[in-house]
Amino acid sequence: MNTVLRYPGSKWRIADQLVSNIPEHKSYLEPYFGSGAVLFNKPPSPIETINDLDDDVINLFQCIRDHSQQLAAMIAAIPYSRKVYDSQFSIVSKDPVDKACAFLIKCWQGYGFKTSGIKTGWKRDKTGRERAYNLSNWYHLPEWIEGIAERLRNIQIEHKPALDLIREFDSPDSFFYLDPPYLLNTRSAKQYQHEMTEEDHIQLLETIVHCSAQIMISGYDTPLYNDYLHTWDTLRIPNQTTSGVVREEIVWMNYTHQLSLYDFGIL
């Protein structure tokens, strides 16, 4: 599947590698959903639940599930235009589909768009590329929206604090993929509408070390995580940031991961 949401911290480039390390489970929970890179690249589970505190994220995926044709038609009729992009920051609509459309315009047409509400410049192609990739992606977006709509119809969509769901869904038959906003001292700026303080991260870590569910959590290398998760398996995966810089991500797992072709650099 193709991504329908350009989102800070997205895992689309490394999704296959993450999915290859997911163990067998009956219930799948992703409490910090974002663009949903892992869920949209893995096989369906018997029970699947996604969650995000960001109203725009939840509204978007609910609209894709329930009104995909209407949303796709709206996107298809909108040009890739600086004027269109700029206008989204002064227009506020209560209609869910209009809100989803505006969110997509901001995410796809803004350079390094941040969901924190900060307006960035309009993104365009000039020279040095064989074609206008940003424009091409925008005009393929309607078909990508239609492509994930059916997948979303079998998924429970939550909208509450992640820790509440982690506690509620905790069981040996569950698997959690956690991709929280990374510690602010490991990155250059705030990117999300709902950031996490160091105390928030400590509460998360103190919760998951006592869970019976199988858990995978992503982050940057940091003493706080290494101290709490020192008994967990780890993977180190290079990934490209929103700004184009390659940084090494750490994936901690409270289970023994199976070696794959990725571990040997073959894929």
Language model features with spans:
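Structural beta-sheet core signal
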Residues: I50, L178, I215-I217
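SAM cofactor-binding core of SAM-dependent methyltransferases
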Residues: S20-S90
